[in-house]
């Protein structure tokens, strides 16, 4: 072994293995070789370093690897050869070892080689022993030469002496090394002292110190270990024994110094002494000396002989005797002499003592010198004051000290003396002398010097010290203060202002003194007898002070009252034992100031004068006085002021007033008295002025004559000649002011010859005394008249003269003439000149009769000749008068003829001619009027026809399945999505309808609505979120009754009550909803839903207040009626179902509480409005979210029943997952179990995706196919493959929009009964729907593998991504606004409280998003989701997924991006999907692209087309909706305008609206919008549509494009979100608050918008419906619906194309919505999602509002949101928070930042960046992933781009609650992705999706908060469930509750 070891070390050196410390440390006892073998160490040993004894050990072991590598070398090669070879092997085979080698080889190698290796060679045993210490990498090693195997120590070894020196090294230089004993056996005998060691040392050493005497012959065993800084440790066994031997100190140290003396001033380097040490004869090494004990000394050694070494001790540093006078030093001799056999110590020690000698270098030190001394009062000169003492500082040889006083610069030295030797100080002069030159209280300073006495010539110079003493003189006697003067005098002006200072002029000096010092010198100054007039400062002074007196109150300074003021100043000492004071008088003389105005003797002067006074008449004399002195008291009268003042004279000196002229103008008849003012001024007319009233009362004079009102009175006698035809009264008036001057009397003075007439003298009435006899006979009179042509009545006329006189003096009178005519004839022949050539005789007679007041008989009519009288009188400016006719007629009057001027005016006006007055040519005038009226009449007819046509078209659209507005399925579903509640109800109700899935979903959503978000435990209830009673909330009602009500009604659910009512309605209408849902859930009954929605829209508008957009449309009225109906229903629902659900969930109470609790529960729930959305984390992403996704068993049963293949795609992702989510959610929620029960009950048919928030989240993630309809609302997460379900989600957003009222409504919906029933019903329906969905999914998978994939991508992305985002990635997507929504949808059983964002995110992530995007926002899932979504498998079908993703997007920006991903996924998926799905996607894409182009002009058409394409069911619903839209869009122009408006609106919303609107339109918006459109007034609807169009058109660029792109794959999902946006945005584009906070309002707006569209031309409805349908289709088509929704809106003008696509799409994926198709397309994920996908489909539809929006956001903006899904708490928080926030600050919440999810950094990040960082795609929905993968890169970029475009618009508007920002962000990002995907709708979807997702989560919360309402969606988790069926409807919900959901 020795040889081996020796060779091995060489090898080791050569190969320098890095001892990878072997398997285990070598035991000390083990043989050296064995330990080395055991230890696998890689040693660095340079070939030259011989000391690596370890290396051979390492070679032996080398971790087996080294062993094997090196072993052969080991044996065959010499050290160096082997070194190279081995090293090479190591390099190749053991790179790890090599890594360590270089570092170790470099430094340690050489050292080891030099020292250790050398010793190893010499002593192989030592080497072996050393090796055993196990080195990990490189453990420290003991120096083999210091191995204490057995140390012999003589028994006389001193205690505390060093008996051995240990050394150790470390190849890795991990110094310092520490030595210590292992165990405590040896602790009492010896101790180990590690010597200082640094990392720069090459060896570390330790001393073994003896602790006690050794017993001879006894063995002491112990173990010593050495550790490096890295923890490597080596131990060695040590043994010592004592020998009976005496240490030969003289042999060891032949010369050793004794005591060394050194002066303290010795210089550095001074040699003190030397020592000689003998070496050990056994060693070759010489002795090595060490000096220990003080750093001031060192030892220098040299070898003087072969046996000895000499060491010289020298000084290193300065010494100071005063500091230390003695040093004990120890000299250690290494390897010193030891007696062989008796002593084997390797070290010997000796001690030396150094004594420092003192040197005279210190001055004296005062030991006694009191610094302060108070001199006693009675001290006299010669008395001793004190004594000082000093000593020499050098204690070694002190010298004597002498004292003295320093007189330099000290005036007091002469007053004192000091004893030179004793230090006593004496007073030399009296204290008074000292006090005379000092200030009182100042100390007397004295400096004393102490100097050493030098007694030898050679001594150092004497040193001196000084000290300063202070003496205080005794206190003086106290004296009082005193003033400079004994009195003071000053002057001040009267009324001097406050603060005026009194000035004292010579000889008065205002100073006060006190000669005392200290406290006795402090005194106060106060004023006595001052009455507060003055104040003095300072109040307190010391020694001396000047004082200042100021005016404080000038009320006493009145010269007129007193000319002077006297007071005293008191100065009083404030000392503790003194009250000495001084008092001085002050007299202040007051200077008079002209401060008084003149005062008149009387307050007013009144005089009575006759009105006829003459010049010079004295009026009055005034007198004023002034108390001021001098000129100030001299008054002049300066002016008379007032009316007629120039008629008076005023004497300036005397004040006499006289009349200045006869024409003075004073007239009693004008006014009874005149008021003037007389002014007086002092200062001789230039100073203060005063005025006094002068009243001149006039005395009336009889200067007025009675005047008759007529100069001639004419009266006609009656036929009986006994009276007059009218009362005959004459009247005269006298203007005099008073009686009797104005009393009038009458008399006849002439003409009353026969005294036949009597005149009453007072009244002036003329009467007949007796029957009058006419003078001439009637015949003659008549004859004469006829012949002369004039009356010969002179003979029959009586002419009287009457006089009127007054009673004044003198009497004044006037006269008048009275003519009395005989009885009048009743016939008269009159010629009338009338306009016209040949007037109609009968009409002319009528007109003339009216004119004349008699009966007119026309004799003849002839033209008027120019020369006839009257011909020239015709006005010149009347061109029509050229032709006139003369009508000769007889006018017969009866006894009383009446002329009605108004009738004449009417007749004339009828002819529109001034000539018509004449009975001339009435025919011409009549003709003109008739013509004008005809034009108006036909215009009205045309308008009525257009209206009827619009209504018919809307009806047809609703009826015809091929119509994108098809109301039965598509539109119905749209309604559902729009009103999440309605949608959910519709799904439930649809259980018996088209498809159990859709119906169940609707019902389920309704139930969800009923239990509202606040009931988090009831997943059903929560997903239902019926509380969104806004138009969006109408989902419940609208789904059930939403088909009837229409989207408008759904949107209309503004208040919680309404929403709850709607929930109830939805329940009531369950059968209808089911039928509709089966048909296409929302879309099937789109018309009905539209009606409902319209109704809702009106109510919502009323509730929201901003629903004006909806009212704008004609549909508004219809919607309003429907809304009222719906509202009443809804209210019932609200009260029972929703309230019960909320109560059960506790959401009504826990609207915010739930949010918190959810948050605490890992923030699994987002509180959206009243809904608590469970933020599901994707399985891979979120702890709960993942489970939730997996657990989201409740895939949205195909919202689109058989009609939508997508529905089957609503795979039950994981029943277990869903249930787990539900359980988790329930556990987390106080009412969790109940919630689950209620949720399941509520949404039996539909997948209980929402049942548990956790489940919901998982559901989203789980289902690639499931569409968490994020759009629906936080809790309305319905995993619907059909977009209609998404509409349900929209319904919740609507509620969110109308959050305040919705929340309230939602709370009522929480009723336990309703909740339980609805939950049970929903569970049943959901189960049925789930089965249907699974069946449909299978069909879709079979028929449309690619389509299914697309559907998966579309529906699942929305749901799965949303869910994933919520839980993980999906949670991120949904986290935004509707994590809860999506999640709830996914796990309907869950109360998808936070589902809105998280779930949407999750769904989106899974389906269409790559997790990439989701990751950044809230969790890795976001990233993955987004990537998945990006997958371009099904660009278009993935869009359907995008619908879900949109929901997710709404929740999280990441989800939006994910939506883009979903788009790409959908693109990828489409291959999987049947061609039809792909085709639909392509159509959508094209439509989207076209929409981008045409959206401005035909946004509505695009929407309609999109809806049409969505699915047959969707088409029907959409057709109905489109019909409505078309009605609204009656004219292309209006449509184009609307489209533009919509697009603009979207843009305005920063894409949020676009997203929302598009989503709303396509998925939920379409239906809901249409319904809402119908519901609100047409104008509102138009407005809404315009907004939508604007949104569509505008977003065309930012949002629509995104949507279109998304449309291809995520677009379907996205449109849903966009329609939501549409709804919300239209209403609140400007105010994103509405969008997010007022889902109802926005929804109403959108609804209005769509309604408007509907009214304008079915186009809007088509747009809405298309959007809805698109949304549904999206679900079916991988979110194509959403994208298409955007696309539809964009392609509104391309409606036909889009509609075709939609129709095709519908055909291809009628059963499954986009998500369903996507699910099929992506069977693997779908199968995983299986049921979940159906659920996803449902959820997708439900979530689509959110999902679409979120998807957009995920894809474009929401993609980042998947991460939010990561944090379900955020989602949950969103639901609660969003509700609360929506209520509180809806606008802000709408902002990305405001969204609760967005508020969470994760959500915001997701929103903004989620696209780029999708969560791990584990949970990615297939539909989402296919398109999402591109999202990872492209999605992220596109999402970002779209998002940036939108974000620039929307992100900048972040203030505008989430909707704008989110829409912008998500739209931009999504748009980019969509563009990449080639889906024009992506942008729109993004906007909508963003908004929708926002609505679901953040937006919804924001909207609700801003509205102060609960987030309808958030409140209605059930709504989300339903939403999956009615994706469009969910979208529409967004319009009402969009903001909350998506924003």
UniProtKB/Swiss-Prot annotation:
Biased composition (Basic and acidic residues): 1047-1058, 1486-1497, 1507-1516, 1580-1602, 1754-1764, 1774-1793, 1800-1810, 1837-1863
Ranges of compositional bias, category Basic residues: 50-89, 1426-1442
Topology within the bilayer: Single-pass type I membrane protein
Tissue-wise expression: As cell intercalation proceeds, a row of stigmatophore cells surrounding the spiracular chamber show expression of Cad86C. Expression is regulated by the Abd-B cascade, requiring sal. Expressed in a broad region of the morphogenetic furrow and in clusters of cells posterior to the morphogenetic furrow. Weakly expressed in the epithelium of wing imaginal disks. In eye imaginal disk cells within the morphogenetic furrow, expression is localized to the apical region.
Gene induction: By hedgehog (hh) and dpp signal transduction in the morphogenetic furrow.
Residues covered by the Cadherin domain: 238-366, 367-483, 484-600, 601-708, 709-832
Protein name according to UniProt: Cadherin-86C
UniProt source species: Drosophila melanogaster
């Amino acid at each position: 072994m020795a040889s081996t070891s020796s060779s091995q070390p060489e090898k080791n050196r050569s190969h320098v293995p890095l001892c990878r410390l072997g398997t285990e440390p070598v035991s000390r006892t083990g043989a050296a070789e064995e330990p080395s073998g055991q230890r696998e160490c890689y040693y660095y040993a340079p070939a030259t370093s011989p000391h690596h004894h370890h290396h051979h050990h390492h070679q032996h072991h080398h971790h087996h690897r080294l062993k094997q590598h090196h072993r052969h070398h080991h044996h065959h090669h010499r050290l160096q050869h082997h070194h190279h070879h081995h090293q090479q092997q190591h390099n190749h085979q053991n790179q790890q070892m090599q890594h360590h080698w270089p570092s170790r080889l470099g430094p340690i190698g050489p050292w080891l080689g030099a020292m250790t290796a050398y010793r190893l060679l010499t002593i192989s045993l030592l080497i072996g022993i050393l090796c055993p210490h196990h080195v990990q990498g490189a453990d420290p090693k003991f120096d083999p030469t210091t191995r204490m195997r057995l140390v012999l120590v003589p028994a006389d070894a001193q205690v505390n002496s060093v008996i051995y020196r240990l050394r150790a090294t470390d190849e890795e230089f991990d110094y310092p090394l520490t030595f210590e004993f292992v165990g405590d056996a040896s602790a009492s005998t010896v101790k180990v002292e590690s010597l200082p060691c640094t990392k720069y040392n090459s060896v570390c050493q330790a001393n073994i110190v003896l602790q006690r005497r050794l017993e001879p012959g006894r063995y002491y065993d112990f173990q010593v270990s050495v550790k490096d800084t890295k923890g490597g440790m080596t131990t060695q066994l040590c043994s010592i024994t004592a020998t009976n031997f005496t240490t030969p100190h003289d042999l060891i140290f032949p010369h050793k110094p004794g005591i060394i003396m050194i002066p303290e001033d010795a210089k550095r380097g001074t040699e003190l002494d030397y020592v000689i040490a003998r070496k050990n004869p056994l060693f070759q090494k010489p002795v090595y000396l060490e000096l220990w004990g003080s750093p001031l000394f060192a030892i220098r050694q040299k070898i003087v002989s072969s046996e000895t070494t000499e060491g010289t001790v020298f000084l290193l540093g300065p010494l100071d005797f005063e500091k230390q006078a003695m040093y004990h030093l120890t000299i250690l001799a290494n390897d010193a002499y030891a007696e062989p056999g008796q002593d084997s110590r390797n070290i010997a020690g000796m001690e030396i003592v150094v004594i420092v000698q003192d040197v005279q270098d210190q001055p004296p030190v005062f030991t006694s010198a009191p610094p302060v001394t108070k001199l006693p009062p009675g001290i006299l000169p010669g008395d001793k004051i004190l004594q000082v003492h000093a000593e020499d500082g050098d204690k070694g040889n002190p010298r004597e000290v002498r004292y003295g006083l320093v007189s330099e610069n000290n005036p007091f030295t002469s007053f004192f003396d000091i004893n030179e030797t004793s230090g006593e100080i004496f007073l030399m002069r009296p204290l008074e002398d000292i006090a005379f030159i000092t200030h009182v209280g100042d100390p007397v300073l004295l400096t004393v010097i102490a100097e050493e006495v030098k007694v030898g010539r050679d001594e150092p110079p004497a040193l001196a010290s000084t000290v300063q003493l202070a003496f205080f003189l005794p206190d003086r006697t106290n004296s009082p203060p005193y003033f400079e003067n004994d009195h003071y005098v000053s002057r001040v002006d009267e009324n001097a202002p406050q603060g005026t200072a009194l000035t004292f002029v010579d000889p008065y000096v205002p100073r006060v003194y006190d000669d005392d010092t200290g406290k006795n010198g402090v005194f106060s100054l106060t004023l006595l007898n001052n009455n507060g007039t003055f104040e003095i400062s300072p109040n307190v002074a010391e020694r001396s002070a000047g004082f200042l007196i100021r005016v404080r109150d000038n009320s006493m300074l009145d010269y007129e009252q007193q000319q002077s003021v006297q007071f005293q100043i008191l100065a009083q000492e404030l000392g503790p034992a003194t009250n000495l004071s001084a008092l001085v008088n002050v007299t202040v003389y007051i200077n008079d100031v002209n401060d008084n105005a003149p005062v008149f003797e009387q307050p007013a002067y009144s005089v009575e004068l006759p009105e006829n006074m003459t010049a010079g008449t004295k009026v009055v004399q005034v007198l004023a006085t002034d108390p001021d002195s001098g000129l100030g008291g001299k008054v002049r009268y300066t002016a008379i002021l007032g009316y007629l003042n120039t008629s008076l004279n005023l004497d300036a000196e005397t004040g006499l007033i006289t009349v200045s002229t006869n024409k003075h103008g004073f007239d009693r008849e004008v006014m009874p008295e005149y008021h003037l003012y007389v002014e007086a001024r002092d200062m001789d007319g230039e100073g203060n002025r005063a005025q006094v009233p002068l009243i001149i009362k006039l005395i009336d004079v009889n200067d007025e004559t009675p005047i008759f009102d007529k100069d001639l009175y004419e009266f006609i006698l009656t036929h009986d000649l006994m009276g007059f035809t009218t009362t005959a009264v004459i009247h005269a008036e006298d203007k005099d002011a008073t009686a009797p001057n104005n009393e009038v009397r009458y008399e006849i003075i002439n003409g009353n010859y026969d005294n036949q007439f009597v005149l009453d003298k007072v009244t002036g009435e003329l009467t007949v005394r007796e029957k009058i006899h006419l003078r001439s006979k009637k015949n003659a009179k008549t004859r004469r008249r006829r012949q002369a042509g004039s009356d010969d009545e002179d003979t029959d006329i009586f002419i009287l003269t009457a006089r009127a006189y007054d009673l004044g003096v003198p009497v004044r009178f006037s006269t008048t003439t009275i003519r009395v005519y005989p009885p009048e004839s009743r016939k008269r022949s009159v010629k009338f000149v009338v306009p016209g050539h040949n007037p109609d005789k009968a009409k002319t007679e009528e007109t003339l009769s009216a004119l004349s007041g008699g009966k007119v008989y026309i004799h003849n009519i002839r033209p008027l000749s120019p020369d006839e009288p009257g011909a020239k009188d015709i006005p010149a400016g009347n061109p029509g008068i050229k032709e006139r006719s003369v009508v000769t007629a007889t006018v017969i009057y009866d006894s009383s003829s009446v002329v009605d001027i108004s009738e004449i005016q009417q007749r004339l006006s009828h002819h529109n001619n001034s000539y018509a007055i004449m009975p001339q040519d009435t025919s011409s005038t009549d003709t003109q009027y008739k013509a004008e009226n005809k034009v108006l009449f036909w215009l009205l007819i045309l308008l009525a026809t257009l209206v009827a046509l619009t209504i018919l078209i809307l009806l047809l659209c609703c009826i015809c399945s091929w119509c994108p507005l098809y109301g039965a399925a598509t539109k119905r579903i749209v309604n559902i999505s729009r009103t999440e509640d309605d949608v959910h109800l519709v799904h439930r109700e649809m259980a018996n309808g088209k498809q159990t899935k859709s119906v169940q979903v609707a019902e389920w959503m309704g139930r969800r609505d009923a239990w509202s978000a606040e009931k988090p435990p009831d997943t059903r209830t929560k997903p239902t979120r019926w509380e969104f009673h806004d138009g969006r909330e109408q989902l419940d009602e609208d789904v059930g009754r939403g088909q009837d009500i229409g989207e408008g009604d759904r949107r209309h659910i503004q208040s919680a009550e309404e929403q709850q009512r709607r929930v109830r309605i939805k329940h009531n209408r369950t059968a209808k909803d089911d039928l509709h849902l089966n048909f296409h859930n929302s879309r099937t009954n789109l018309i009905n839903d539209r009606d409902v929605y319209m109704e809702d829209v009106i109510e919502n508008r009323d509730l929201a207040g901003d629903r004006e957009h909806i009212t704008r449309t004609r549909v508004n009225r219809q919607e309003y009626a429907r809304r009222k109906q719906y509202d009443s229903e809804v209210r019932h629902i609200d009260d029972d179902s929703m309230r019960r659900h909320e109560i059960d969930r506790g959401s009504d109470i826990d609207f915010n509480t739930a949010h918190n609790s959810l948050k605490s529960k890992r923030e699994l729930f987002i509180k959206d409005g009243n809904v608590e959305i469970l933020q599901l984390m994707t399985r891979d992403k979120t702890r709960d979210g993942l489970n939730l996704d997996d657990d989201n068993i409740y895939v949205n049963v195909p919202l689109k029943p058989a009609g939508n293949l997508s529905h089957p795609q609503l795979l039950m992702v994981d029943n277990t997952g869903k249930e787990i989510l539900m359980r988790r959610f329930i556990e987390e929620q106080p009412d969790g179990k109940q919630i689950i029960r209620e949720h399941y009950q509520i949404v039996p048919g539909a997948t209980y995706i929402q049942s548990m928030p956790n489940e919901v989240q998982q559901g989203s993630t789980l289902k690639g196919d499931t569409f968490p309809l994020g759009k629906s609302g936080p809790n309305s997460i319905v995993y619907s493959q059909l977009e209609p379900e998404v509409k349900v989600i929209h319904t919740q957003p609507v509620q969110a929009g109308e959050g305040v009222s919705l929340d309230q409504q939602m709370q009522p919906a929480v009723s336990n009964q309703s909740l339980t029933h609805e939950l049970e019903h929903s569970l049943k329906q959901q189960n049925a729907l789930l089965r249907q969905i699974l069946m449909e999914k299978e069909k879709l998978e079979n028929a449309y593998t690619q389509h299914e994939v697309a559907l998966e991508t579309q529906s699942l992305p929305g749901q799965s991504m949303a869910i994933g985002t919520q839980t993980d990635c999906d949670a991120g997507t949904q986290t935004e606004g509707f994590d809860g929504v999506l999640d709830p949808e996914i796990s309907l059983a869950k109360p998808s409280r936070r589902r809105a964002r998280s779930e949407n995110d999750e769904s989106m992530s899974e389906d269409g998003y790559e997790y990439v995007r989701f990751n950044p926002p809230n969790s890795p899932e976001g990233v993955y989701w987004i990537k998945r979504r990006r997958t371009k498998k099904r660009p278009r079908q993935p869009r359907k997924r995008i619908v879900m993703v949109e929901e997710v997007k709404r929740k999280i920006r990441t989800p939006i991006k994910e939506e883009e991903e979903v788009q790409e996924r959908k693109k990828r998926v489409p291959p999987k999907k049947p061609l039809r799905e792909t085709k639909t996607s392509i159509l959508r894409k094209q439509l989207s692209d076209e929409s981008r182009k045409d959206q401005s002009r035909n946004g509505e058409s695009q929407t309609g087309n999109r809806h049409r394409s969505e699915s047959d069911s969707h088409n029907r619903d959409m057709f109905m909706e489109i019909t409505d839209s078309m009605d609204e869009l009656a004219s292309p122009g209006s449509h184009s305008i609307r489209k533009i408006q919509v697009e603009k609106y979207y843009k305005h919303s920063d894409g949020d609206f676009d997203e929302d609107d598009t989503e709303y339109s396509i998925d939920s918006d379409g239906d809901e919008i249409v319904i809402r459109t119908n519901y609100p007034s047409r104008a509102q609807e138009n407005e809404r549509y315009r907004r939508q169009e604007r949104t569509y058109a505008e977003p065309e660029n930012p949002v629509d494009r995104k949507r279109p792109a998304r449309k291809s794959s995520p677009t379907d999902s996205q449109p849903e979100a966009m329609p939501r946006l549409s709804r919300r945005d239209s209403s609140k584009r400007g105010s994103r608050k509405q969008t997010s906070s007022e889902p109802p309002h926005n929804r109403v707006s959108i609804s209005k918008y769509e309604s408007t569209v509907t009214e304008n031309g079915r186009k809007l409805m088509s747009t809405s419906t298309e959007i809805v349908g698109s949304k549904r289709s999206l679900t079916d088509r991988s979110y194509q619906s959403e994208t298409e929704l955007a696309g539809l809106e964009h392609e509104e003008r391309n409606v036909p194309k889009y509609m075709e696509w939609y129709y095709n799409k519908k055909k291809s994926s009628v059963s499954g919505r986009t998500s369903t198709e996507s699910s099929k397309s992506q069977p693997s994920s779908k199968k995983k999602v299986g049921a979940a996908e159906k659920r996803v489909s449902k959820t997708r539809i439900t979530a689509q509002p959110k999902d679409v929006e979120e998807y957009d956001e995920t894809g474009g903006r929401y993609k980042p949101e998947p991460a939010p899904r990561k944090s379900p708490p955020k989602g949950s928080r969103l639901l609660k928070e969003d509700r609360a926030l929506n209520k509180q600050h809806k606008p802000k919440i709408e902002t990305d930042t405001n969204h609760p999810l967005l508020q969470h950094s994760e959500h915001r990040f997701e929103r903004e960046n989620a696209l780029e960082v999708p969560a791990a795609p584990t949970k990615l929905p297939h539909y989402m992933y296919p398109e999402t993968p591109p999202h990872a890169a492209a999605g992220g970029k596109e999402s970002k781009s779209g998002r940036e475009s939108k974000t620039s618009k929307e992100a900048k508007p972040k203030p505008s609650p989430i909707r704008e920002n989110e829409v912008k962000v998500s739209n931009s990002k999504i748009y980019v992705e969509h563009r990449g995907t080639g889906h024009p709708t992506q942008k729109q979807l993004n906007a909508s999706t963003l908004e929708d997702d926002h609505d679901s989560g953040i937006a919804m919360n924001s909207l609700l908060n801003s509205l102060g309402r609960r987030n309808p969606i958030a409140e209605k988790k059930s709504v989300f469930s339903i939403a999956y069926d009615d994706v469009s409807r969910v979208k529409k919900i967004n319009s009402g509750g969009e903001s909350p959901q998506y924003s």
